[in-house]
Each structure stands twice: as C-alpha cells, then as structure tokens.
C-alpha cells in the first residue's frame, strides 16, 4: 500500500513537471490555460489553497469564455479555496460568479453560498438562499441537504417549530435518504427539548421502526429511555423495547436500574408523595434489587420529611439488616431519634451505641454519646450514665451547654452511687455559672452537701454568696433561702431563720413546693419555741 502511494506521488510530480514544461513552452494558448487549470486542481487536492487559487485565477484570465462549464468550475474552486482559509466574503464573491454563469454546477454554487452565510451566523440569509436553491434547482442532488440545512438553521435561531416543519418536509419528500434519518432523529430531539414528551416518543418510535439498526435508531432508543425515566414509566419502556425491531435487549438488570433511577429523579424534584409510591413499587418489584438499600434510605428521608415515624422505623430497620451499608449511620440517627421521642428509651440506647461504633466523624460520635448519656440517665443506669458523661466530656469541641448537661447527669449518678466527693466536684464546676439551670441547681447542691456534712459555716458562706450573685432561676434561689434557714436553725439562730422564711414567703411568686417547705419550717420553729 505504501509503495502504491509512493508511485502515485511520483506520477503526480512527473505530471506537474510536464504541465510546467507546457506553460514554459506555450504562451497564452489553450494548452497553457488547461495546464493552469490542472495545476490548480493538483494544488487544491494537496491543500495548497493559495497556490491553487492563483492557478485557477490564471486559467480564468486565459480562458476565452467558450468553456463556461470549466470557468464556473474554476470560480467554484477559487470560492472553495477562500472558504478553506475562512475568507468568507471572497468565497461568496466567487460562488456568485460561478452561479451567474448558469451552468449545471450552479446548484453547488448556491448551496455553498448558503453554507457560507451560515458560517457567518446569517441564518436568515442562509434560509433565503436554500429556499431559492430548491426553487431554481428542484432536481438538484443538493436539494435534500438544503432542506436539512434549513431545518438546522431554524434550530440555531431557536425557532424549533419551523425546524420541525422543515425536517418533516424532508421526510415526506425524501423518506429513503440517509439525511432523512438524521432529520427524523432531530424531530424527536426537538420535541424532547421542548418537554413535549408524547410527541418525542412518537417521533423516536418512527426512527427506530423506519431505520432499524442505524446509529440514529440507537440514539433514539437512548433518548426514549431517558424520556420514560423522566416520566417514571419504565414498564411502558420495557414493553416498547421488547416490541421494537433491531434486536433491542432490555434485561431485568437494566429494568431494575431504570425503575430505581426514575423514582430517584422524582424524589430529587421534591415530589415526595409520588416518590414514595415509586420507591415502594420498586421494592415490591425488586425486593433484592441492586438499589434496594438506596430505596429504603430515601423512604427513611421521606418519612422524616412527612413526620411518618413508623415509616422511618420500618425502612431504617431494613437498612440495618445490612449493618455495613453506606446509609447505616444516617439510618441510625433517624431511628434513634424516633425511638427516643417515642420513649422507647432502651431501644434508643441500643441505636445510639451502634451509631457510636459506626460514626465516621466527630459530630456524629458526639451525637451518639449525647444520646447514650440521655438514655442512660432516663433509664437510671448510673454506671452507664457516668461512663457516657465521661466519654462526652473528653470531646474536644463540646459546646458549653452539652458540657453542663454531662457534668450534671454525672453528678446525679455519682450521688446515687454514694460517691459524694466526685458528685461535689462536678457540682462545684457547674456552680461557677448560675445563669443556666444546671449551675443554679448545682450551687444549691454544693451548699446542701456542706449542710449534710454539718459544715454549717461553709454552707452559710456558700448560700450568702449565692444570694448575693443571684440567678434567673428563682426556684433554686428560693431553695437556697430555705436551706439557709435550716443552717441558722441548726446553729441556734432561730430568729434569723424565721426572718428569712417570712421574707421568702412574702416575695416568692412560684406555684410549687416552696410554700409547703416554708410552712413546715415556720411551724417547726413555732413548736420548738
């Protein structure tokens, strides 16, 4: 093959040498003109467009005008040379010259003029020229392409309705043309882009039925698949694919994938009720499908969105049958929250413990530890509470609110476990800030601990300090007044005890057990004195 190419090249070079010899020996005669014409073609095929244009120009100057066909051809080739180097205005000039000679190649000139207008983005001008071409040369082999290019011009002008009309005209006039296959596919695509799915489906079906096995049919089936996925009508597509010519295979795995994809698209568009129906249908059809875990996960999210807690428990449970799946963490978060809010505390504790084991970041681990702490405290599991609080308190980015909560629950658990010193340490830490409810109670508990230890002076000092700094939590401040009266009674200062109780009785507005505490102590002081 390579040898043939070398021989051909040598033959052309010999021919060029002969032509140049002819030019050098002849002056302004027919042979001289023809030699320039042939040299122009050789340069053109070698893509030396500047040289080719020069030879054709020389031929036009030498040709006496008798051979109009060759002259028109030379003008066309000069136009082609300018087109190849994107010199559009010059190209149009020479194509116009060629067309005006009224030779059989005039349709080519017209067609090229139209294409150049398109390259200049003058789509209106291109359409006008194409219409004139079809009118002047109805039998032209370029007529088919002209109608197609007219349709493409309308597409580029965003005039899809006119584009569809042009493509349909092409299908009616030249149904067997390869260009008609492209036009038929374009019609389907334009309807698809307009969102006119039913028209697009019919157009694409015609492509597949009329041109089975073609590239256009393959692409039409691809777009049909996308349309049916968008419409969430996969069963229809399966039936259509199996009925279509061209040996189109649509196996169960692909139907599994497309059914899920269609449902997922509905979910992503925010159409929750429709997505729920579609995802449930997918799970019913493919209970062990490739995307069953994804479907259960999205149904969990829909359940959360719709506050359908039974739905969350059902689908999170299905997900946790495969504990190492990528959705397990989020499923546990949703599941544990529902269980906790429904006061299924032991179940919530188990879920939070699983979440802690699986947590892949600090935030989720902290969420799990917080859940474990709260569940353990509600279950009165002091040992679990102490461990959970201790784990939480070593977290590096713990918020002040969670830190206070952990210290408080641990202090309560230590108290229950008769670990008074450890409880007191946590209460003292909390008591540094009495603006929050935990600190307000803790300040009181520190004083109560001192009172219980009969350290009355220290208890009095603690309580007076509390009264001085105050707190927005009136109940614990009132309890501190009551405890201070107990301290004074224990140290023989019954008058002071009575004054604090009476003052509290007059000023405290709460509707709780403080009133009964005051009454019982005043009665006791009255009885003893």
What are these regions (language model features)?
Residues 1-529:
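Acidic, polar-rich low-complexity tracts and alpha-helical solenoid repeat scaffolds
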């Amino acid at each position: 093959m390579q040898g043939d190419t070398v021989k051909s090249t040598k033959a052309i070079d010999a021919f060029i040498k002969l032509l140049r010899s002819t030019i050098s020996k002849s002056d302004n005669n027919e042979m001289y003109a023809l030699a320039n014409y042939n040299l122009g073609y050789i340069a053109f095929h070698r893509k030396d467009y500047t040289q080719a244009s020069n030879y054709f120009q020389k031929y036009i100057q030498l040709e006496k005008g008798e051979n109009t066909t060759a002259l028109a051809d030379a003008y066309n080739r000069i136009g082609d040379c300018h087109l190849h180097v994107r010199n559009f205005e010059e190209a149009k000039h020479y194509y116009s010259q060629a067309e005006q000679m009224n030779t059989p190649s005039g349709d080519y000139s017209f067609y090229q003029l139209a294409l150049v207008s398109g390259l200049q983005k003058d789509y209106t001008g291109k359409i006008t020229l194409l219409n004139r071409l079809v009118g002047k040369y109805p039998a032209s082999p370029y007529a088919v392409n002209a109608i197609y290019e007219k349709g493409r011009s309308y597409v580029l002008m965003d005039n899809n309705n006119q584009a569809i009309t042009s493509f349909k005209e092409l299908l009616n006039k030249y149904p067997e043309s390869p260009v008609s296959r492209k036009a038929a596919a374009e019609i389907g695509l334009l309807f698809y882009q307009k969102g006119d799915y039913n028209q697009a489906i019919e157009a694409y079906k015609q492509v597949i039925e009329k041109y089975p096995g073609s590239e256009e049919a393959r692409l039409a089936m691809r777009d049909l698949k996308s349309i049916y996925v968008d419409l969430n009508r996969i069963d229809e597509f399966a039936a259509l694919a199996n009925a279509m010519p061209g040996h189109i295979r649509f196996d169960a795995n692909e139907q599994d994938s497309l059914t899920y994809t269609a449902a997922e698209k509905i979910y992503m568009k925010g159409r929750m009720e429709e997505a729920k129906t579609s995802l449930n249908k997918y799970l019913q059809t493919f209970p062990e499908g490739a995307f069953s875990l994804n479907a259960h996960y999205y149904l969990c999210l829909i359940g959360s969105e719709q506050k359908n807690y039974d739905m969350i428990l059902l689908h999170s449970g299905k997900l946790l049958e495969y504990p190492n799946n990528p959705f397990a963490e989020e499923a546990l978060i949703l599941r544990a929250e529902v269980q906790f809010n429904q006061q299924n505390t032991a179940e919530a504790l188990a879920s939070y413990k699983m979440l802690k084991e699986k947590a892949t970041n600090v935030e989720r681990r902290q969420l799990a530890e917080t859940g474990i702490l709260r569940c353990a405290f509600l279950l009165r599991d002091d040992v679990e509470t102490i461990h959970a609080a201790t784990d939480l308190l070593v977290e590096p980015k713990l918020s002040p609110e969670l830190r206070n909560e952990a210290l408080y629950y641990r202090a309560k658990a230590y108290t229950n476990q008769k670990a008074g010193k450890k409880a007191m340490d946590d209460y003292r830490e909390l008591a540094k800030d009495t603006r929050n409810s935990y600190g307000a109670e803790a300040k009181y508990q520190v004083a109560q601990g001192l009172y219980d230890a009969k350290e009355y002076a220290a208890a009095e000092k603690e309580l007076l300090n509390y009264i001085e700094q105050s707190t927005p939590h009136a109940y614990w401040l009132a309890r501190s007044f009551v405890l201070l009266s107990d301290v004074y009674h224990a140290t023989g200062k019954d008058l002071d005890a009575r004054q604090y109780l009476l003052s509290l009785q007059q000023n405290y507005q709460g509707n709780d057990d403080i009133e009964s505490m005051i009454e019982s102590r005043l009665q006791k002081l009255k009885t003893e004195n």
